[in-house]
Regions:
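Short, highly charged
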Residues: 1-49
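Glutamate identity and glutamate-enriched acidic tracts
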Residues: 9, 28, 52-55, 87, ...
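Short, low-complexity, polar/charged sequence segments that are solvent-exposed and flexible
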Residues: 9-12, 54-58, 79-84
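Alpha-helix boundary/interfacial micro-motifs
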Residues: 18-19, 28-29, 35, 55, ...
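Active-site-adjacent structural patch at catalytic or cofactor/ligand-binding sites
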Residues: 35-43, 52-67
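Well-ordered alpha/beta subsegment
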Residues: 60-129
């Protein structure tokens, strides 16, 4: 429990809204989080008053799109944070199907986010690109 809170802080996450941890964009406080980290166990939040008693099989990192950064830029923040958390907590990175997240899975996520960014860019009016 408290190991998780310490690791989250070391990885640059802040405890906040909805009782979960967030990575906020540098200098853009009102823009919302780049991504967030929730408990895998329902309801997903962390009770900081009882964090030392927390036992959980894992956490999930997620981002809402559109967000304060382009999707691919946000992912380039999520991945090293997830890797740092796994290192600090002696954990493993898993994909959405709970399989090991390897190079191929990471490349697939990057491709999806790159396509999403392109779609968003092409949907903007010409003067806003």
């Amino acid at each position: 429990g408290s190991d998780l809170a310490v690791a989250a802080e070391k990885a640059g996450l802040e405890f906040g809204d909805r009782g979960i941890f967030h990575r906020m964009p540098a200098g853009e406080r009102g823009a919302g989080p780049v991504f967030s980290m929730a408990n895998m166990l329902k309801p997903g939040s962390f009770d900081m008053a009882r964090i030392e008693h927390l036992e959980t099989p894992g956490v999930t990192l997620f981002m809402a799109l559109p967000g304060p950064l382009p999707a691919l830029d946000a992912w380039d923040t999520v991945l090293p944070t997830a890797q740092r958390l796994a290192e600090l907590l002696d954990g493993n990175l898993l994909d959405e199907k709970r399989g090991a997240l390897g190079r191929q899975g990471i490349a697939h996520i990057r491709d999806q986010l790159r396509a999403w960014d392109r779609q968003q860019e092409s949907a903007k009016p010409r003067g806003m690109r």
